[in-house]
Amino acid sequence: MIVVFYYTQSGQALDVAKRICQPLAEAGTEVVWRPIIPQQTYPFPWNKYEFFDSFPETRLGMPPSGIQPLDFSGIEKAELVMIVGQSWFLSPSLPLQSFFENEQVKAYLEGKKVVFVNACRNMWLMTGRAVKAYLHEIKACQVGHIVLQDTAPNLISALTIVRWLLYGKKQSSWLLPAAGVRKADIEDASRFGDIIKIAIEKNDFQHLQPQLLAAGAIDYKPSILLLEKTGHRMFGHWAHFIRKRGGFRDPRRRTRVNIFFYYLLVVLFVVSPFAQLFFYLTYPLHCVGKHKREDCYIESNN
């Protein structure tokens, strides 16, 4: 049995999970689905202000509410748990954070083998690190990490994701491609399910992550991840700056949230292109191979 806990707004994360699990279901493995439903509702498409107002709590790991009760009956002896979600503001989404902080979830995941699947734009590193820390704290055993990401250039994907998040327009239009993970990439995600199926059959999860990586489970883009690491640090300062004016949905912090929005526009469309150019000019100095091993592989003692 494999249990899939998932959070999705647009349906993309669920599409990814279904495709990964298809080979398992076809082989006779029981796949049990459990949606993660936050007590605090998050709209989709988003209102612009509400989306950016959720930033400080997302970055600081302070979800404003918990999740609806989950049904754990009949899944106690699952051979594998898959957790599927997405990144918000270079961190796990607030519903994912609420999920990991739930006491029943902690008790259930203790000792379980876990694969984390992230369907995101193109910055997944800090989310992966946060999830890894959550799982380590509750004594779960992370055996896999899969990232399906938007393959469009960074600035293009920023435009398409805003169009999708705020206006609900996923389809290609004018000169912009469709937003999100490409349909072909979602369809091809079944190859990860084939690898997971063999691991379950052999009860051998020690080599699962290297096998997933060999199949393309993570497309490692060092210049983007350098931007992410820098952005994550700066986001921490901004999150504290905004929260000094109030907590989640406090109208007193509206001005600071709006300032952050314009700061983000400048970073995305002015600063980041030059930062990427600088990275490529200094590429030999960045020890990319070492960082890739640290960022993509999972220690066997997790």
Q: Which role does the model predict for each range below?
A:
Residues 94-95, 126-129, 157:
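A short secondary-structure junction signal
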Residues 39-43, 150-155:
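A short acidic, often aromatic-flanked loop/helix-cap motif at beta-alpha or helix-coil junctions
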Residues 55-58, 133-141, 161-174:
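A polyampholytic, Gly/Pro-enriched intrinsically disordered region
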Residues 1-85, 90-95, 101, 109-110, ...:
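N-terminal beta1-alpha1-beta2 submodule of the flavodoxin-like/Rossmannoid cofactor-binding fold
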Residues 153-230:
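Glycine-rich phosphate/pyrophosphate-binding loop and the adjoining helix
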Residues 113-153:
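Short, glycine-/small-residue-rich phosphate/pyrophosphate-handling segment
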Residues 22, 97-111, 129-140:
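Short, surface-exposed basic-aromatic patches at helix termini and helix-loop junctions that form
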